[in-house]
Design a protein with these regions (language model features):
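Mature catalytic domains of secreted/periplasmic carbohydrate-active enzymes
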Residues: 1-346
């Protein structure tokens, strides 16, 4: 268990009444789905992390996309950053996805609008590195703005909406100084405040878009807790703006422990005891959060036990599912989700 997830427990007593009521509503949801889907869905590595030179764990010898490039990080990074040019998920059916999640018994959906690699799964005006960009063959599809299409389908199906957003962005030029080498040459917020201010504005513009153009948003799920402190994106200002646009918004500023971590998010493990905080355990269906062909998956019975354990201890359970690069939910995942729903109804 990552210690930083629990190190900043604040409880709910110091929160305003409206937020305490919203958190009670959130706790009533019990079970949700988190979707990791992006250009990384093409390859057999995990999402985003293989771009980082120091993250050897993410580029194991059995990972084909790594060995095919002679374990050359520059070659790997270059090809990764061009994956969007072949991203054409024509099998994407947002209504089918939403109905499947309802059948599984889920009450809310958290979608990766942007992971650490910086690829945007919505029609942002801040960058061309997006699914609606002209270099992406899917940009002419009626559902090219997959975030909008999915959230609309979710709401029609009665599902609450959670926006996953990475505070880190390993593609944005304002996040790096001087070259885009993830995690090793981040713009210095003290020595280069002008560049960092551009990144802060970039981030705020993206959050404003997501809070303005995508209907009712219930939860803002902010990842990349390691950027706390030295990489100040003026969280108070950003959250105030988001809540002005989305009244009642719940914010999970993950693993930071500030006043904007409305609930804590233990990852890959369920706490042994009830926590003083509102919490949500997030665990993937298989070893990876994203789609990896033929990876071992938990059984439906195992997942139901995890859901019930989390709920019994006072927490929500967020199940990680990885859609395929073609826009479909894998058959094995679909079968397990349907069986989860059957087991929980009996």
């Amino acid at each position: 268990m990552r210690e930083d997830v629990f190190a900043h427990s604040t409880g709910t007593g110091d929160k305003p009444e409206w937020l305490r009521e919203r958190l009670k509503w959130f706790q009533s949801l019990k079970f949700g789905i988190i979707l990791h889907w992006g250009v990384y869905s093409f390859w057999d590595c995990c999402e985003s992390w293989p771009l980082v030179p120091d993250c050897d764990w993410s580029r194991r010898d059995e990972i084909r996309c790594w060995t095919e490039r002679n374990k050359d990080i520059d070659w790997f990074q270059r090809d990764y950053r061009n994956l969007h040019k072949q991203f054409n998920p024509t099998g994407f059916d947002p209504d089918q996805w939403a109905n499947l999640f309802v059948e599984a018994g889920a009450k809310y959906v958290c979608f990766t609008t942007k992971h650490h690699d910086g690829f945007c799964m919505w029609d942002t005006e801040t960058t061309d590195y997006k699914i609606t960009g002209e270099e992406c063959p899917f940009h002419t599809n009626p559902n090219a703005d997959v975030t909008k299409a999915l959230f609309e389908s979710c709401r029609r199906a009665g599902l609450a909406v959670s926006v996953y957003f990475s505070k880190a962005d390993w593609h944005c030029p304002y996040y790096w100084s001087p070259e885009p080498r993830p995690m090793s040459q981040t713009a210095n917020t003290v020595d280069d405040p002008e560049t960092w201010e551009k990144f802060v504005q970039y981030t705020h513009r993206q959050i404003r878009e997501l809070m303005t153009n995508y209907g009712k948003v219930d939860i803002l799920w902010l990842d990349a807790g390691w950027v706390r402190g030295k990489e100040d994106i003026r969280m108070a200002e950003m959250v105030a703006m988001a809540r002005e646009l989305q009244p009642g918004l719940i914010v999970a500023n993950r693993a930071v422990g500030d006043e904007f971590e409305d609930f804590v998010t233990p990852e890959r493990e369920i706490p042994d005891d009830q926590l003083p905080d509102v919490w949500e355990a997030c665990l993937p269906l298989g070893p990876d959060w994203k789609y990896v062909e033929n990876q071992p998956l938990k059984s439906a019975a195992q997942v139901v036990e995890e859901i019930e354990t989390a709920n019994r201890r006072g927490g929500n359970f967020l199940l990680g599912i990885g859609p395929k690069y073609d826009g479909t939910i894998p058959d094995r995942d679909t079968e397990i989700l349907l069986e989860i729903g059957r087991l929980r109804r009996n």
